[in-house]
């Protein structure tokens, strides 16, 4: 997301999409990382057309697509006005994106809840996010209470976003159990990073 040479052009996206479908093992496919469609712009491409071209094969195959967004900051690194965020979800939905993973690095629900409502208004699925870290403060109870507020605000899904891969497997497993006991119908998705070496154990714990 920070280096253009690692980002695909629209012609590459269109070529790879059918292969992802043929693999037969994905229910969801990411349409963007933590970046806006700057890469398309750098290539002189229209990002609106690029996203539509990439999502089309997945929609035909019944595979959902999802995006990442920073709540109050939308797809930027600084606050974005509410009317612009509201329009963003309508545009992304029209482009063929089904789910938006809404997060705030500080787990501040005031930065997330308005976006949940805007996404629902636009017909998207808002996946509210818990940014996972490891400290004496970041306990199962801490995260579960945030999940309660996000679900009460209308989020049908929760993402455990272990951005640095340092979430402890045992804690993550207990967190999933705690949320599921109270909200059995809420879908929980785990997002991990493999650098510190804990991610496979975390995957096993959250699945269990």
Features from the language model and the residues they span:
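Catalytic cores of alpha/beta
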Residues: 141-146, 150, 196-207
């Amino acid at each position: 997301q920070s280096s253009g040479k690692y980002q695909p052009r629209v012609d590459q996206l269109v070529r790879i999409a059918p292969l992802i479908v043929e693999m037969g093992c994905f229910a969801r496919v990411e349409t963007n990382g933590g970046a806006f469609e700057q890469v398309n712009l750098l290539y002189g491409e229209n990002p609106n057309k690029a996203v539509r071209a990439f999502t089309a094969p997945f929609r035909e195959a019944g595979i959902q697509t999802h995006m990442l967004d920073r709540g109050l900051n939308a797809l930027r690194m600084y606050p974005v006005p509410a009317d612009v965020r509201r329009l963003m979800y309508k545009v992304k939905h029209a482009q063929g994106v089904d789910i938006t993973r809404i997060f705030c690095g500080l787990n501040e629900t005031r930065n997330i809840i308005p976006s949940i409502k805007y996404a629902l208004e636009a017909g998207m699925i808002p996946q509210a996010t818990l940014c996972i870290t490891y400290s004496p403060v970041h306990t199962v109870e801490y995260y579960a209470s945030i999940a309660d507020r996000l679900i009460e605000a209308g989020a049908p899904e929760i993402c455990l976003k272990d951005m640095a891969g340092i979430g402890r497997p045992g804690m993550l497993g207990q967190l999933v159990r705690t949320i599921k006991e109270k909200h059995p119908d809420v879908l929980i998705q785990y997002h991990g990073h493999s650098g510190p070496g804990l991610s496979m154990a975390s995957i096993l714990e959250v699945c269990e």
